[in-house]
Amino acid sequence: MIYLIIILLKFQKNLYDLLYSVIIKEDYLRNINGILLLDKPIGLSSNLILQKIKKLFKAKKAGYIGTLDPIASGMLPIFFGDATKFSDYLLNTNKWYKIKAKLGEKTNTLDSFGKIICIRPILNIKKLNIEKILSEFQGEIYQKPPMFSSLKHLGKPLYKYARQGIYIPREKRKVYVHYIKLLSFSKKYFSLTIKCSKGTYVRSIVDDIGEKLFCGAHIVKLRRTKLFNYKESHMIDSNKLYNIKKKFNDLKKLDECLLPIESIFKKLPIIVVNDDIINRLRNGIKLNFWKIKKNNLFKIISKDTKKFVGIIDINKYGRANSIKLIK
């Protein structure tokens, strides 16, 4: 009987702790809006660092675009609150990388985080050999996604199949490399800079270069330096964020690290409307903008508050095709 009472008391305590944590969590989390250009550290998955940053900011809603491999560092855009509505406008933008690769070794993940599966001699490779091969990867190319990737097959990421030793056939996909340039070359290593389209696997490019050099190659360092119009200088690393939190113990100081949502749309033409029009748009009322005779995406600015409230796609007949507004 005593044991039964103890079990019931433990169950009651666990249930209380669970309910308490859920209630506190909901009250504790904040509705914040903005974009953090995180300098992702090496060794963590993009999703894991997202959860850490979300917890640090005590944010109710957050997401990211442009997955970076655990080996990679650099720009990982994290979107908070209403900013998540507009993240898809960065999905198809170009990305810039700096890469360091090692010759003579091929790994199962195509980077140094994997297992070496083949070692071959490096035979008389010259700088000109590499530069000539690089020219073959400029422009429109077709590449097969690596098995160790987050690309899904039947709802399951490919890397999970790879870890189980299951091979999944993949079709080649078209990507675009705007430029690829050799930065340095030594006997065992070479460094590149590359600007490429969405969906480009730079690990696969390095692996293909290694095969064309008949010795194999894999990435040992990978850093995303730029995405869209955001530059490397705009990034902030997680250590700095934690230091800000520790020093000031003020979430508003962390919020100062966020870029406004409208930073995505700096180059868009502006349409200024009063709050009455904005409220009608919020309520789903279709309006015509007869004075606009050009098919374009516009940034909406409130005439009353002078603040960004969303974007609207207007066709050449002055009709709104689509609208996205912040709350």
UniProtKB/Swiss-Prot annotation:
One MF annotation (Gene Ontology) recorded for this entry: RNA binding
Q: Return the broad EC class.
A: isomerase
Q: Tell me yes or no: is Isomerase among this UniProt entry's keywords.
A: yes
Name of the protein in question: tRNA pseudouridine synthase B
The Gene Ontology biological process terms listed for this entry are: mRNA pseudouridine synthesis; tRNA pseudouridine synthesis
> Which PANTHER family does the record cross-reference, listed alphabetically?
PSEUDOURIDYLATE SYNTHASE TRUB1, TRNA-PSEUDOURIDINE SYNTHASE
Function, as annotated, reads: Responsible for synthesis of pseudouridine from uracil-55 in the psi GC loop of transfer RNAs.
- Write the lineage as a comma-separated list: Bacteria, Pseudomonadati, Pseudomonadota, Gammaproteobacteria, Enterobacterales
Q: List, from the UniProt record, the residues annotated as the active site of this protein.
A: D69 (nucleophile)
InterPro entries tied to this protein:
PsdUridine_synth_cat_dom_sf, PsdUridine_synth_N, tRNA_psdUridine_synth_TruB, TruB_C
Q: What UniProt keywords are attached to this protein's entry?
A: Isomerase, tRNA processing
